[in-house]
Structure formats: structure tokens, C-alpha cells
Amino acid sequence: MHPTRSFQGLILTLHNYWAEHGCAILQPYDMEVGAGTFHPATTLRSLGPKPWKAAYVQPSRRPKDGRYGENPNRLQHYYQYQVIIKPSPPNLQDLYLGSLRAIGLDPTLHDVRFVEDDWESPTLGAWGLGWECWCDGMEVSQFTYFQQVCGIECSPVSGELTYGLERLAMYVQGVDNVYDLNFNGLEGDEKVTYGEVFLQAEQEYSRYNFEMANTEALRQHFIDAERECEAILKAGAPGPNANHQMHKSVFPAYDQCIKASHVFNLMDARGVISVTERQSYILRVRNLARQCGEAFLLTDAGGFNFKREGE
């Protein structure tokens, strides 16, 4: 399935490319997240000393970006392709350029530039040194070396690549409207477009995000998720005298952190959060993320008993 002829072909090509370079090809996380970085395969696995290589597609929701399906390239629900490699290899940029060749963008035939743009996620307490990758004047992906996640220093540093799949597909297919993208690579009566798959949902979720979401219920949902996250972390924490006992309930707690973040984004879209409240909500989500990150380091996956080479 050719990557320049269909949305699904683009995804399959990236899967094959990164699988050939040693990445575990994971599935999307089954939660409402604002970006692929929220997937625990990135947020949590970027912490601790254990090596990690993974790639996956992640449906992402940003309620404020909805335009009722009337904007040709702005969506409240879209797809990111995420690659996370720890420790970051010295040839990460070359690997990335190789992925562009795989999907039909030869860097020698196009104006490919890396524009410095350090990345930050306030709710995750994360930041990294980064670059946007521009191809012929259009941003197609983000290239980041994580320095801190969940307020915790990353050691070793992870390399992260994020492709905006719709934008990339529009570029390689040569279309100006996301809804005109060929989704399945067929033509005639069998052709399925991006609009046939997603336009109605985009219209309906825009109405929900901006007009219908129950704001009082959302405020309570945030409180509930916050309390549940902290209760789960407390229940799974090692006892005070158990120096070698690991944490037992990080992932369920992190799910509640993700829920709190999405509820915050919905309230923001509904316009019911003041400037001062906004900062308070961000700090509350960041606090949950920090607690989850600290707990993850007390697990096997987080490297609690891991010994690096030479130790």
C-alpha cells in the first residue's frame, strides 16, 4: 500500500520502517489524550535507566481546536505518529530523514530544514530541546530530546519524534483540504476519504466541546479524577519500612491523571476557566503527573532494580 496514495498506507509504511529499526510497534492508548506524548509508553517509559524503543499512532484530542468541520486543516481530533527511543541514538536525525524517504519525501529533492523550537508540556511537567522539521515551508514533524518529564530529570535522555499524520498526508498526497485525503488508497466507488470517516464526528464533537459539555459535571469529574489518582498511588505505595518493595499501582493512577488533563481541556474549550483558575488547574495536573512519575521509578519497568552496563 503506497504511502503517497492513502492515509492508512502512510501509517503502515511508518510502522514497517520503525519496526525494521528495532522499535516495538504499539497500539494507541485507550484514553482521551491531548498528544501522543501522554501515552504511558512515552511519558512513563522516558523515565528511569532502562532502554526503550517504541512507535505507535495516537488519536489526540484538543477540544479548543475544533472548527465544526469547516476549516480545511484544523481539527479537534487528529492523529500523531510517535517514536520514542531511549537512550537517544547519535544518528536519530538520520533515522528520521530515512523515514521521510520511506514515505516518498526524498530530502535531496525537497527543502528540508530543522527549525529550533524547544518543546514544553506544562501539564506533564515536561520539556526538551527540540526542532520543528519543515519540508518546503510546511511543518511536518517535531524532533525532541527530553530533558525532564513529570518534573523528573531524564537520565538517559530520550529522543522523541512526532509526526502530524494529517498534515504529512496532505503534503504527500498534494491536497489542500484534510477531508479530501484518500484514506484507503482505492479509487472510484471504492474510494474512502478522510471526510467520510471523520467529518460528521468532527462537527458533532465541536458542538459538544463548545456548546454542550456540562461544565458543573466537568468540574466534579476533575475533582474525582484528582482524588482517585492520589488514592490509587497511596494504596500502591511501598510501606515505610519496606526499602526494597516496589510500587504496585502506577498505571491505574496515571489513567486518572490523563482523565483530569482531558477534563481540564474540555472546561477550557467551554470558556469557564479564568486566567488564575487555568494556572491552578495546570499545576494540579502537573502535581499528579509528578507523583505518577516518582512512583514509576519504584517499579521494575521504571528501573528500580535495573543495573546499567559496567555497574
From Swiss-Prot:
Tetramer of two alpha and two beta subunits. Keywords: Aminoacyl-tRNA synthetase, ATP-binding, Cytoplasm, Ligase, Nucleotide-binding, Protein biosynthesis. GO terms for biological process: glycyl-tRNA aminoacylation. Its main location: cytoplasm. It is found in: Cytoplasm. GO terms for molecular function: ATP binding; glycine-tRNA ligase activity. It comes from the Bacteria. This is Glycine--tRNA ligase alpha subunit. CDD domains: GlyRS_alpha_core. Belongs to the class-II aminoacyl-tRNA synthetase family. Its EC number is 6.1.1.14. It is an enzyme of class 6 (ligase). It catalyses: tRNA(Gly) + glycine + ATP = glycyl-tRNA(Gly) + AMP + diphosphate.
